[in-house]
Amino acid sequence: GSRGIGLAIAKRAAKDGANVILAAKTAEPHPKLPGTIYTAADEIEAEGGQALPVICDIRDEDRVKEAVDQGVERFGGIDICVNNASAIQLTGTLQTDMKRFDLMHQINTRGTYLVSKMCLPHLLKSENPHILNLSPPLDMHPKWFGPHVAYTMAKFGMSLCVLGMAEEFKEQGVAVNALWPRTAIATAAIKNALGGEEVMHLS
């Protein structure tokens, strides 16, 4: 949420007066990517919302719980959970090392599941609860798998969370949806990802 699509969503919500819990793995600036959770918090508050920047590695269950608890204590509850964190490497099977494979699945699939799970007890108390995942349609066409099967598997895991949780919590009134750009967006994260230059030409 400190840059790119996540920050854009947070700023748009802030225009409507939203309070935003902004979680990122580190407060240090990325050598290739602009912004930190603190600069993002300033931008959110400039739009009219309130921001709580929290350092949180979403692979760490205890830290996720602490971040959620801090947000609830500060703002009184949670109405919307946006799962935007994502690790990306657009490489084929032989070019993808297992450390990167594990990272993509830990952040994209497991992280989305964990953050949603920790937010749900609070969402169930909300009058109009939503979970929004930045993940693609479950399109089984081979063209989405061939060039970067490991990344697609990890992103589809996020989409399966949408499908499953929407069904599981529909009677309790929790709306669970996915948002996915129709075309690739030329963000700094895409540009700097291994294999991202080819995608940039399509955006």
In which residue ranges do the predicted regions lie?
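A short helix-coil junction within the Rossmann-fold of NAD(P)-dependent oxidoreductases
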Residues: 16, 74-75, 91-92, 118-127, ...
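Substrate-binding pocket helix/loop in short-chain dehydrogenase/reductase
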Residues: 92-93, 97-102
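Short-chain dehydrogenase/reductase
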Residues: 1-75, 88-89
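Catalytic loop of short-chain dehydrogenase/reductase
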Residues: 124-125, 130-171, 180-185, 195
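Conserved catalytic-site loops of classical short-chain dehydrogenases/reductases
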Residues: 79-80, 102, 129-134, 174-177
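Conserved hydrophobic beta-strands of the Rossmann-like cofactor-binding core
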Residues: 67, 81-82
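A short, exposed helix-loop element centered on a Lys and neighboring polar residues
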Residues: 116-117, 163
